């Protein structure tokens, strides 16, 4: 594992030293073998797109599909570039709006936490540069799911932690947040909440892109426990290699919001963002691999035991 990690790190770091314009040229070259030869998850992407946009004909679906793969190749080289990107360049290319409003709201409301809903939209890896925009007394964190490949898990942890934030493993989320609460540490924590939960973690379903979809509820559940500010990250790609993330408030008093309403609002906002530019969402993820019918069947079997 260590050898694999050091080899991968050395290769990625050397590639990151190339100027971004040259890396985008590499991205353009990557598109053909990724889409036409390797056909990386083509069936999954096509199935996800056709189910999400039943009103679009095949020609339009294929157009979105190809634009997604072009962006996916950009995402790869942009992520590699993070290994050597300077703070100045990072702040020029990944701009955050609304951080000052979050910080002032934390002071005004006497809150230690702000939880931010995120999706796999645009380059979510660049969101890890948020600490560059925060005052020293406000810590940043992100909840992540460890990768099965230990070498690449270590590689991505190094990549995400280099900006001064903290990666919190999903299973350690509540414990770590309680530790920070006891220490009275102010913290902005990002929750990527558009993945498919495991069967035993499904508690709520949303209407998302024309399908009943199981969703994570941890953001609002833990947010209510620690009385966090709840925000949503509205991310846009302004042009190639440039992004803007605007933090928009959902509530400053989560305990007063009915259960699942915050999750539903996030899901709706994410859907609207995807509809505006569908090529920037991660369509290669098996988002709808768990159906409500199968979930109900499993629930009924559990009740019989």
Regions found by a protein language model. Name each.
Residues 110-171, 198-207:
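Catalytic core of membrane glycerolipid acyltransferases/transacylases, capturing the structured
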Residues 1, 35, 117, 145-146, ...:
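A generic secondary-structure micro-motif detector
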Residues 1-118, 123-124, 153-159, 164:
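Membrane-anchoring hydrophobic helices of lipid-metabolizing enzymes
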């Amino acid at each position: 594992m260590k050898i694999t990690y050091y080899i991968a790190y050395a290769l990625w770091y050397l590639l990151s030293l190339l100027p971004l314009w040259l890396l985008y040229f590499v991205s353009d070259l990557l598109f053909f073998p990724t889409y036409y030869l390797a056909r990386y998850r083509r069936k999954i992407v096509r199935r996800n797109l056709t189910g999400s946009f039943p009103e679009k004909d095949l020609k339009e679906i294929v157009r979105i599909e190809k634009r997604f793969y072009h962006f996916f190749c950009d995402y790869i080289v942009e992520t590699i570039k993070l290994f050597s990107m300077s703070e100045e360049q990072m702040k020029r290319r990944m701009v955050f709006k609304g951080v000052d409003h979050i910080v002032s709201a934390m002071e005004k409301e006497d809150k230690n936490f702000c939880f931010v809903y995120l999706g796999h939209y645009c380059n979510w890896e660049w969101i890890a540069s948020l600490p560059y925009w925060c005052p020293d007394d406000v810590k940043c964190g992100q909840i992540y799911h460890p990768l099965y490949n230990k070498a690449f898990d270590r590689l991505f942890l190094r990549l995400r932690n280099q900006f001064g934030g903290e990666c919190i493993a999903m299973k350690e989320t509540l414990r770590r947040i309680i530790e920070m609460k006891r220490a009275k540490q102010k913290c902005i924590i990002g929750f990527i909440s558009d993945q498919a939960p495991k069967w035993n973690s499904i508690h709520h379903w949303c209407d998302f892109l024309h399908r009943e979809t199981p969703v994570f509820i941890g953001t609002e559940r833990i947010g209510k426990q620690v009385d966090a500010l709840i925000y949503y990250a509205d991310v846009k790609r302004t042009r190639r290699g440039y992004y803007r993330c605007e933090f928009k408030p959902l509530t400053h008093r989560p305990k007063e919001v009915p259960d699942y309403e915050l999750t539903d609002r996030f899901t709706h906002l994410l859907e609207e963002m995807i509809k505006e530019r569908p090529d920037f969402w991660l369509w290669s993820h098996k988002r709808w691999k768990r159906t409500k019918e199968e979930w109900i069947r499993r629930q009924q079997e559990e009740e019989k035991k």
